[in-house]
Amino acid sequence: MKDWIAAFIRSKSISSNSQKSYTYDLQQFMEVTQGQVNQQTLLTYQQTLLTLKPAAQKRKLSAVNQFLYFLYEEGQLERFYKLKALTSPATIKQRPQVEDLSPLWTETAFLDGQTIALLIGFLGLTPSEIAELTVDDLNLDFQVLTVQKGQTKRVLDIPKEILPYLENRLTGVYLFDKKGQTYSRQWFFNRLTEFVSSIGRSDWTAQKLREQYILGQIKQGKSLDQLVKQLGLKSSMSLEKYK
């Protein structure tokens, strides 16, 4: 980062005093962010400016924004971050942590809820996607599941541990079949809730379990672009917070 600060200063036609001012502000920026540019480190830096007078904040933010744009132009950043002055202390959101999902395999009488939880936590499906899964979407020979959402279709590998939970659901039209019809969203919510409550993890909502799937995939080295395809999303916008 120090080399890039020097390169940035050299790229500007400014006086010696201005060079010193830019260098001081950017070195301070580097120390606070530890050379890492992401939403959390930038928010931390913005918070350090809260005690300064507006004019000083404006000067430092201008220097940093110019530097960030320089890094973006030089291909050192995937996107351009533009900082604004904070008007009040902000809470730094901690990045969610990967949790141990082994309790999902607990032997239970709530098999519907358990299967729903496994499909969310280990395949990243949403309850609405699970509700639309048909028996024809499941291929046990190749251990894959086809998920169709609108005009998009994706084929997901099924972890072998989940196969036994699906093999007994091949008698109807849908994997979760109500006499040839799908169950309501409320039914899926209730089944999931009763299962996670029974294992002492009532905080494991569908959203939380899907987030755990995302975090687990990122930990394995998957890129956001790969996750967009796996999750059937149109863009990576909703995944940016996990970078």
Language model features: what each stretch is:
Residues 2-90:
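N-terminal core-binding DNA-recognition domain of tyrosine recombinases/integrases
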Residues 77, 88-103, 151-160:
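DNA breakage-rejoining catalytic core of tyrosine-based enzymes
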Residues 98-127:
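Basic, Lys/Arg- and aromatic-enriched nucleic-acid-binding interface segment
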Residues 119-142:
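Short, charged phosphate-coordinating catalytic segments
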Residues 136-137, 182-185, 233-240:
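Short, basic interhelical loop/turn and adjoining N-cap
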Residues 143-148, 216, 225-243:
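Short functional hotspots where side chains directly engage DNA or cofactors
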Residues 148-193:
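C-terminal catalytic core of Y-nucleophile DNA break-rejoin enzymes
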Residues 191-229, 233:
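Short, basic (Lys/Arg/His-rich) helix/loop patches that form interaction surfaces
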